[in-house]
């Protein structure tokens, strides 16, 4: 049943917000004065966890009711048309990382806090009464007061204009925007600023626990990104400022608040002198993602949450397009292939997965659609597909039309397709409808029929059990031979294979560039032809070959055993993209072996075979003038060599640790995680783990923290494992925002798995209370399913999670993840012997 939209009762035009935050008492007091148009009585205004002290309409007190289950204030205005509604309220300041909340950090041994906000999806209503729906755009004037101390500053969407005699900081009126994009923060902060060539103020803010140089990288990327987007979109950035704020506690990765973008520290700050290239790429893409939203999401906003993909999918594509423009030598589209494409293809093959666009009626269901592999990754693949069909000139022309016609308003997916269609003869809406409205993706079977004709068929691809509902897609084939641009039918006949092959002069392949969202199963004739010419393939083609074979093996359409020889063939590649694909596939072989079994010993020998020549070539130390490719290949090879228990690698890593034990943070960031992991696994005890945990608490360097966490959770020491689990609920050690990563690290560790699994089952109520209202909560289920692959764990997983299947935020995830584990259990049972035989043969 559809839930009533509050916007139908009242259209806000302007908010005057007066908010007073007291950190000591953990209270929020304020007034929300809303000017707008009354369309229905009673008027419905959102609130959550508030005490409503009074409501006035046009200066007169009126009757109201607070309806907690609807998160509503029901106001009998007695008027229609223009009205001013003034609501006085109070609310608690909580540690939930939603609404207005404190972030905690240490500086010179003292605990401190800054206050920040997180209002997406429906948490603005915890900060001030409002019509908390994307379509209810309005302007906002903010006056902010707090228990201010010397040296503290306040930030908001717009610049500060004055501090009044009562201590309220006043900010410029915003442009017309949605409530979920309002943001403010205050506390003791350091900053660095610059201006774009058009005069927009760019700033980066962080706590003083960080070294000033950690702000430099973000400042440079943010400035250049704003300039890039203004040119690409042919639409000016409409605000006077773009501030980037790192919050010590933040549930999401980052949030695109207009003019005041908030981030986890790990996704904004880095040491420019000692951060891996991969981490620099990651931080750059997070920043450019959020800044892409300043147009796509903020300037033009989805009309309702069922078009969330319109915000996220486009920003996800633009983060790569912009970074490629800013840093072309990074070859950032390769990262798109290894992260977004891989994530989308894996997730979208499970029966029961959501489509990109799905109907949402109840706000309780909104957070459940934030499936990053679908809304972000698959959605961005759809737009990459559109870009490859249109070309950049037509894309830019269509986007300019879109922004010109919808700026400061709301839009739907159809509005975007209509805009893009003005720049092309293609019916973009018709092509995209099949991809957005239905889940999954096709496998295209390419085969030479008995009559010698090359034929293509499409059907939905599943990993695990799946119900074939006869779905059909409009597939951009991207063929390297004479073939239709779009495959619309279930089956097509392309004519004589012999003629097509002769005309092409090379093996025939589909989805060249891996930009379309489908995989290909070639028959033996076509597959053998491709393998005969495999050395001529470029890195993306090789990645795609391994990717499709891996997925077909996961779907039991081919055997994993048949892929093992190809891993050996690609082992000497000088492409980090190919090496990534190689070890992504090799990692899947681990599920077929029992820990410490003879089969695992053989698998470790295979890893040694795959990595030893590369380790010998690259060594452990980064060489002056080394190529970016070699810098990025080294971590894969060192990790593989350590898994293989290569004695020389273990010795080399131990020596590096010993020589740098007094300053581990200064270790080269490209090798640091592997040095630390090796030490913990092969030479460490509970004492070392305790030392590294203290180091984790001490440092403010986000990437170093990640390395320390990876090392600590890899321990074999049972006493250390017990201590780690004991710290899961100690926010002074493990912040709630980082808890899922700690849990996943220990769960994936054979020695720590039982302790981690026992903890989440025993302390689920605590976990629910701590992070249960957050969109990231379901990740605890996702990562558990990602690790489990045995019948015993499947049984335990179902026993624990299936009773929770009616929780809206968790329901889809639980159902899907049962299928994920079931598919692995069935695959292992069917393939285990063949895979282990293939591994034994490869090392013979």
Curated annotation (Swiss-Prot):
The active site is at 290 (proton acceptor). The record marks 376 as: Transition state stabilizer. It catalyses: Release of an N-terminal amino acid, Xaa-|-Yaa- from a peptide, amide or arylamide. Xaa is preferably Ala, but may be most amino acids including Pro (slow action). When a terminal hydrophobic residue is followed by a prolyl residue, the two may be released as an intact Xaa-Pro dipeptide. InterPro entries: Aminopeptidase_N-like_N (IPR045357), Aminopeptidase_N-like_N_sf (IPR042097), ERAP1-like_C_dom (IPR024571), M1_APN-typ (IPR034016), Peptidase_M1 (IPR001930), Peptidase_M1_aminopeptidases (IPR050344), Peptidase_M1_dom (IPR014782), Peptidase_M4/M1_CTD_sf (IPR027268). One of its GO terms (molecular function) is zinc ion binding. PROSITE patterns: ZINC_PROTEASE (PS00142). Its cofactor is Zn(2+). Transmembrane segments: none annotated. GO terms for biological process: peptide catabolic process; proteolysis. Zn(2+) binds at residues 289, 293, 312. Its EC number is 3.4.11.2. Keywords: Aminopeptidase, Cytoplasm, Hydrolase, Metal-binding, Metalloprotease, Protease, Zinc. It is found in: Cytoplasm. Substrate binds at residues 120, 253-257. Pfam families: ERAP1_C, Peptidase_M1, Peptidase_M1_N. Belongs to the peptidase M1 family. This is Aminopeptidase N. The lineage of its organism: Bacteria, Bacillati, Bacillota, Bacilli, Lactobacillales.
């Amino acid at each position: 049943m559809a839930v009533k939209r509050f916007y139908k009762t009242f259209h806000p035009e302007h908010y005057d917000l007066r908010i007073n935050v007291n950190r000591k008492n953990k209270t929020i007091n304020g007034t929300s004065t809303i000017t707008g148009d009354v369309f229905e009585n009673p008027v419905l205004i959102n609130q959550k966890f508030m005490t409503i002290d009074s409501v006035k309409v046009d200066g007169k007190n009126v009757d109201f009711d607070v309806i907690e289950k609807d998160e509503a204030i029901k106001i009998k205005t007695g008027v229609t048309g223009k009205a001013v509604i003034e609501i006085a309220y109070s609310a608690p300041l909580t540690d939930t990382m939603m609404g207005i909340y404190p972030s905690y950090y240490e500086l010179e041994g003292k605990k401190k806090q800054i206050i920040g906000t997180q209002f997406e999806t429906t948490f603005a209503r915890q900060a001030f009464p409002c019509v908390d729906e994307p379509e209810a755009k309005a302007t906002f004037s903010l006056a902010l007061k707090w228990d201010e101390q010397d040296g503290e500053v306040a930030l908001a969407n717009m610049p500060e204009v004055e501090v009044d005699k009562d201590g309220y900081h006043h900010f410029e009126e915003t442009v017309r925007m949605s409530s979920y994009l309002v943001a403010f923060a205050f506390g003791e902060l350091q900053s660095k600023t610059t201006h774009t060539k058009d005069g927009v103020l760019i700033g980066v803010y962080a706590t003083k626990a960080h070294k000033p140089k950690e702000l430099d990288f973000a400042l440079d990327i943010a400035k250049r990104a704003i300039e890039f987007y203004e040119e690409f979109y042919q639409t000016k950035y409409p605000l006077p400022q773009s501030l980037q704020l790192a919050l010590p506690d933040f549930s999401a990765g980052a949030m695109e608040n207009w003019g005041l973008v908030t981030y986890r520290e790990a996704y904004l700050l880095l040491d420019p002198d000692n951060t891996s290239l991969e981490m620099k790429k990651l931080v750059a893409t997070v920043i450019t993602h959020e800044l892409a939203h300043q147009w796509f999401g903020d300037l033009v906003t989805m009309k309702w949450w069922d078009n969330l993909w319109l915000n996220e999918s486009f920003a996800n594509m633009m983060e790569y397009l912009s970074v490629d423009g800013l840093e072309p030598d990074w070859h950032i589209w390769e990262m798109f292939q290894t992260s977004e494409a891989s994530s989308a293809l894996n997730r979208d093959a499970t029966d029961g997965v959501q489509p990109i666009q799905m109907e949402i009626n109840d706000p309780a269901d909104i957070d459940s659609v934030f499936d990053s592999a679908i809304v972000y990754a698959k959605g961005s693949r759809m737009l990459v597909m559109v870009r490859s069909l249109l070309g950049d000139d037509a894309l830019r022309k269509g986007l300019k039309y879109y922004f010109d016609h919808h700026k400061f308003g709301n839009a739907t997916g159809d509005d975007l397709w209509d805009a893009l269609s003005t720049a092309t003869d293609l019916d973009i809406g018709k092509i995209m409808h099949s991809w957005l409205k239905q889940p999954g993706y096709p496998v295209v079977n390419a085969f030479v029929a008995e009559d010698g004709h090359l034929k293509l068929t499409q059907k939905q691809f599943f990993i695990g059990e799946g119900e074939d509902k006869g779905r059909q897609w409009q597939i951009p084939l991207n063929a390297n031979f004479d073939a239709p641009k779009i495959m619309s039918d279930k089956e097509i006949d392309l004519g004589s294979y012999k003629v097509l092959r002769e005309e092409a002069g090379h093996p025939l392949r589909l989805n060249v560039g891996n930009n379309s969202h489908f995989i290909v199963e070639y028959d033996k004739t076509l597959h053998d032809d491709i393998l005969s010419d495999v050395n001529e393939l470029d890195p993306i083609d090789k990645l795609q070959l391994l990717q499709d074979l891996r997925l077909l093996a996961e779907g039991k359409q081919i055997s994993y055993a048949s892929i093992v020889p190809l891993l050996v063939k690609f082992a000497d590649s000088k492409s980090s993209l190919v090496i990534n694909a190689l070890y992504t596939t090799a990692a899947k072989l681990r599920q077929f072996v029992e820990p410490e079994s003879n089969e695992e010993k053989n698998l470790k020998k295979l890893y040694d075979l795959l990595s030893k020549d590369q380790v010998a070539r690259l060594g452990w130390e980064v060489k002056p003038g080394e190529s970016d490719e070699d810098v990025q290949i080294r971590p894969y090879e060192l990790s593989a060599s350590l898994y293989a228990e290569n004695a020389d690698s273990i010795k080399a890593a131990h020596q590096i640790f010993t020589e740098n034990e007094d300053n581990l943070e200064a270790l080269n960031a490209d090798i640091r995680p592997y040095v630390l992991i090796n030490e913990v696994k092969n030479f460490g005890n509970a004492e070392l783990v305790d030392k590294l945990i203290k180091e984790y608490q001490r440092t403010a360097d986000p990437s170093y923290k990640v390395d320390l966490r990876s090392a600590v959770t890899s321990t074999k020491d049972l006493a250390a494992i017990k201590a780690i689990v004991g710290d899961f609920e100690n926010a002074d050690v493990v912040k709630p925002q980082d808890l899922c990563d700690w849990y996943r690290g220990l769960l994936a560790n054979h020695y720590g798995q039982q302790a981690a699994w026992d903890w989440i089952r025993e302390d689920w109520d605590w976990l629910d209370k701590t992070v249960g209202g957050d969109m990231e909560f379901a990740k605890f289920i996702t990562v558990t399913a990602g690790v489990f692959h045995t019948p015993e764990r499947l049984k335990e997983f179902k026993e624990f999670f299936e009773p929770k299947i009616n929780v809206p935020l968790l329901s889809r995830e639980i159902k899907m993840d049962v299928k994920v584990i079931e598919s692995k259990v069935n695959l292992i049972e069917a393939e285990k012997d063949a895979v282990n035989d293939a591994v034994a043969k490869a090392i013979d």
